[in-house]
């Protein structure tokens, strides 16, 4: 959330999030589109579904950030799930049933503040996706992970885990 303002102002990107977060950034002059749990909206790039997530939600100044959420983004070629910095939740099981098969699941793996490696493996099973891009890890001590151990655990579960350095990309 700390980079949203700078990125949106630099790129002109629209902020898509819950009502409270969009309202916060609109006060800073940034265009947004508010959503809420269970909602979907079709944009020029594809359809966005707002999904459940479980974690705290506040801004650095203490402003309440509303109920947390994740997203499923559908384009003409791909469908991906962005869990956000959530815990494992049983609601994830609904995603493939309600929205459809995923090409990639972007899941937190750092533990302590989010789910860890073992829970991310379970989450990838819940959402029915064997390709996972790990996020929310290694930025500070509490969420450091052993990359080799994480990749090995995913491989033993017959899943692929991608742990990209900052600035890298992944082609679907």
Name each model-derived stretch.
Residues 34-100, 166-172:
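Core dinuclear metal-dependent hydrolase active-site scaffold
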Residues 1-26, 31-33, 97-106:
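Active-site metal-binding motif and surrounding structural segment of the metallo-beta-lactamase
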Residues 9, 13-16, 49, 73-130, 135-144, ...:
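Metallo-beta-lactamase
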Residues 1-4, 25-27, 60, 91-93, ...:
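Short glycine-/acidic-enriched loop or helix-start segments at secondary-structure transitions
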Residues 5-7, 30-31, 63-64, 95-98, ...:
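Short, glycine/charged-enriched secondary-structure capping and boundary segments
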Residues 14, 22, 26-40, 121, ...:
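Binuclear metal-ion centers of metallo-dependent hydrolases, dominated by the metallo-beta-lactamase
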């Amino acid at each position: 959330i700390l980079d949203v303002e700078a990125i949106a102002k630099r790129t002109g990107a629209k902020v898509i999030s819950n009502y409270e977060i969009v309202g916060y950034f609109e006060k800073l002059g940034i265009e947004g589109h508010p959503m809420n749990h269970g909602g979907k909206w079709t944009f020029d790039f594809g359809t966005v579904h707002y999904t459940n997530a479980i974690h705290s939600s506040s801004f650095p100044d203490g402003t309440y950030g509303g109920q947390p959420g994740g997203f499923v983004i559908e384009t003409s070629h791909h469908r991906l799930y962005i869990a956000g910095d959530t815990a494992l939740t049983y609601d994830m099981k609904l995603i493939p049933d309600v929205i459809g098969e995923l090409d990639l699941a972007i899941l937190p793996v750092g533990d302590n503040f989010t789910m860890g490696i073992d829970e991310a493996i379970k989450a990838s099973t819940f959402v029915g996706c064997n390709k996972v891009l790990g996020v929310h890890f290694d930025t500070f001590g509490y969420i450091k992970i052993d990359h080799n151990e994480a990749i090995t655990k995913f491989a033993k579960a017959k899943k692929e885990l991608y742990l990209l350095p900052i600035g890298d990309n992944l082609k679907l």
